[in-house]
């Protein structure tokens, strides 16, 4: 396949592979290459000389593979309509000024290992491939342990990202759904099993990151309780074991909680630091997230 860019043979996570677009002039025809990120790659923005550029970056260790995507009948028909429109506009122009343009979509992917002949599934949903929390992402977490200086949590999901296929079982997989168990039950059972095995991403909410005011007087025990579902934002990758998270925003904090350390009923936020159970009327302190 002819293209205007020299691709690296081996890639590793974070390695730049190619820009999003490339051009080439061949026999008086402008060829525009549109590089599409495939499995094992991701489109990331970079700053270069004050300009924002988008480039395809590897997320796996393996061999770089690029192949041209075949156009569907609808795309070919649309291109034919665009070319006829351009020809009508260039009737008055001289033949030397008319330049033909061709757009080619190139799928760029990284295959694990070094097998160049290995085939990938083109119909796989790439949204499920890389769902790792990164800086700035909003995540849903569950509190697992408390101390005077911090709250330890486990990350359940990344907001605005699809949930991964749950190992072939449940509504999100290819297996049979158990009676009385829907998608929520299947997802909860899988996350519970992952939690027991210690396979979830872990995070830390430090006392100075709980809220933006009166940081020195924050009492973690009055803001969170074990079992609470907390909406937080990723501050940094942390110490290599735990993500550093923050709830120092009005829309961040506890979204679901139960009274009496999880033994009571579901509570609802009445203000930014108080939750109430509508059944018993019991109130407990929390750092609540603004619901809307």
UniProtKB/Swiss-Prot annotation:
MF terms in GO: RNA binding
Signal peptide: none
Annotated region (Disordered), positions in chain: 67-98
Pfam families according to UniProt: CSL4_N (PF21551), EXOSC1 (PF10447)
Major subcellular location class: cytoplasm
Modification type Phosphoserine: residues: 94
Keyword Iron-sulfur part of the UniProt annotation: no
Any single biological process term in GO: nuclear-transcribed mRNA catabolic process
Keyword set, alphabetical order: Cytoplasm, Exosome, Nucleus, Phosphoprotein, RNA-binding, rRNA processing
Gene Ontology cellular-component annotations: cytoplasm; cytoplasmic exosome (RNase complex); exosome (RNase complex); nuclear exosome (RNase complex); nucleolus; nucleus
Entry-linked InterPro entries: Csl4, CSL4_N, EXOSC1_C, NA-bd_OB-fold
Record's keyword annotation contains Phosphoprotein: yes
Compartment(s): Cytoplasm; Nucleus, Nucleolus
PANTHER family on file: 3'-5' EXORIBONUCLEASE CSL4-RELATED, EXOSOME COMPLEX COMPONENT CSL4
Role this protein plays: Non-catalytic component of the RNA exosome complex which has 3'->5' exoribonuclease activity and participates in a multitude of cellular RNA processing and degradation events. In the nucleus, the RNA exosome complex is involved in proper maturation of stable RNA species such as rRNA, snRNA and snoRNA, in the elimination of RNA processing by-products and non-coding 'pervasive' transcripts, such as antisense RNA species and cryptic unstable transcripts (CUTs), and of mRNAs with processing defects, thereby limiting or excluding their export to the cytoplasm.
Family under the similarity heading: Belongs to the CSL4 family.
Further remark: Present with 5550 molecules/cell in log phase SD medium.
Subunit structure, interactors included: Component of the RNA exosome complex. Specifically part of the catalytically inactive RNA exosome core complex (Exo-9) which may associate with the catalytic subunits RRP6 and DIS3 in cytoplasmic- and nuclear-specific RNA exosome complex forms. Exo-9 is formed by a hexameric base ring of RNase PH domain-containing subunits and a cap ring consisting of CSL4, RRP4 and RRP40.
Protein name: Exosome complex component CSL4
């Amino acid at each position: 396949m002819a293209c205007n860019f020299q691709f690296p043979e081996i890639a590793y996570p974070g390695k730049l592979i190619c820009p999003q677009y490339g051009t080439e002039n061949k026999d008086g025809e402008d060829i525009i290459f549109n590089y599409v990120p495939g499995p094992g790659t991701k489109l990331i923005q970079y700053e270069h000389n004050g300009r924002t550029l988008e480039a395809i970056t590897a997320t796996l260790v393996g061999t770089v593979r690029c192949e041209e995507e075949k156009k569907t009948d609808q795309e070919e028909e649309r291109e034919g309509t665009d070319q006829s429109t351009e020809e009508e506009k260039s009737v008055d122009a001289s033949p030397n000024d008319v330049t033909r343009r061709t757009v080619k979509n190139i799928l760029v992917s990284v295959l694990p290992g070094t097998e160049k002949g290995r085939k990938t599934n083109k119909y796989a949903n790439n949204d499920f491939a890389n769902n790792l929390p990164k800086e700035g992402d909003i995540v849903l977490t569950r509190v697992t342990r408390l101390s005077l200086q911090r709250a330890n949590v486990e990350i359940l999901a990344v907001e605005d990202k699809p949930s991964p296929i749950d190992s072939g079982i449940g509504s999100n997989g290819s297996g049979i759904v158990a009676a009385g168990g829907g998608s929520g039950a299947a997802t909860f059972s899988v996350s519970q099993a992952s939690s027991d095995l210690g396979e979830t991403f872990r995070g830390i909410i430090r006392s100075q990151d709980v809220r933006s005011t009166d940081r020195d007087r924050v009492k973690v025990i009055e803001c969170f309780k074990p079992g609470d579902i907390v909406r937080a934002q990723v501050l940094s990758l942390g110490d290599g074991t735990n993500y550093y998270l923050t709830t120092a925003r009005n829309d961040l904090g506890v979204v679901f909680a139960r009274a009496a350390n999880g033994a009571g009923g579901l509570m609802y936020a009445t203000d930014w630091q108080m939750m109430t159970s509508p059944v018993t009327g019991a109130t407990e302190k929390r750092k609540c997230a603004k619901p809307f």
